């Protein structure tokens, strides 16, 4: 039941590639390679040697951690409650873990090295999209605060740009689409923050490594007549390809106070 609540509450997981390969295996640290591009091919004349480039690699590591939350309910609370405290505890435990996983995914994205300052306008969205240094196709999700989402949408309507009809939205509750970027409102970001993430199955922006699925345990303190319930999950979220991320600082539009 808690795992069901967790999956329903998770919102930003689609921005990450979920990897369950560590489940049931020893170790709490994952080391992964990061390859650098060898460059475009060049014209080679007849009889000339093909230039050989070395594939550049560097490694990074991420450590598995545990997110946990617990509740306790007295027998008096169970007997006198109008609702269903145990069911509500289950729901809230799933929500608590989901919020922590979402927070960690966003924190990983914030480590991106491609940075830009923009205004909350259609032009600002274009400026951020121009930072992506590749020409590969992929859905771009722009995560902004509710206030900035409203400003961008108003500017889009004024300039006859954008659409409220979104096909194949990556994130539940996507607000609207402008210049091909799916704008998502989130109170997890401040009014000076915006995150742009390009989807790529081959080289995702973020990876979410799950060591163990959510585990729920209950116990009784018979001396105090208390029911204890805990939930925890072992995982880590890390920035895998920062070329798929643009971290923007939002400033007020010219003329705004």
What kind of region is each of these model predictions?
Residues 32, 56-114, 133-134, 142, ...:
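Long, contiguous amphipathic alpha-helices that act as assembly "spine/axial" helices in icosahedral shell
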């Amino acid at each position: 039941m808690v795992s069901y609540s967790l999956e329903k509450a998770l919102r930003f997981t689609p921005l990450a590639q979920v990897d369950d390969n560590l489940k049931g295996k020893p170790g709490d640290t994952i080391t992964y390679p990061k390859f650098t591009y060898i460059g475009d091919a060049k014209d080679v004349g007849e009889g000339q040697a093909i230039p050989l480039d070395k594939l550049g690699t560097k490694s990074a590591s991420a450590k598995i951690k545990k997110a946990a939350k617990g509740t306790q309910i007295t027998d008096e609370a169970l007997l006198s409650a109008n609702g269903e405290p145990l069911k509500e505890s289950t729901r809230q435990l799933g929500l608590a873990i989901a919020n922590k996983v979402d927070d960690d995914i966003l924190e990983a994205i914030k480590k991106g090295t491609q940075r830009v300052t923009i205004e909350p306008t259609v032009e600002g969205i274009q400026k951020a999209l121009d930072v992506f240094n590749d020409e590969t196709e992929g859905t771009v999700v722009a995560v902004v605060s509710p206030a900035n989402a409203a400003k961008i949408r108003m500017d889009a309507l004024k300039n006859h740009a954008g659409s409220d009809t979104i096909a194949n939205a990556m994130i539940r509750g996507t607000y609207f689409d402008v210049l091909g970027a799916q704008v998502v409102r989130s109170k997890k970001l401040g009014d000076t923050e915006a995150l742009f993430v390009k989807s790529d199955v081959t080289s995702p922006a973020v990876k979410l490594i799950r060591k163990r699925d959510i585990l729920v345990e209950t116990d009784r303190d018979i001396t105090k007549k208390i029911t204890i319930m805990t939930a925890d999950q072992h995982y880590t979220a890390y920035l895998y390809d920062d070329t798929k991320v643009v971290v923007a600082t939002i400033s007020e539009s010219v003329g705004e106070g």
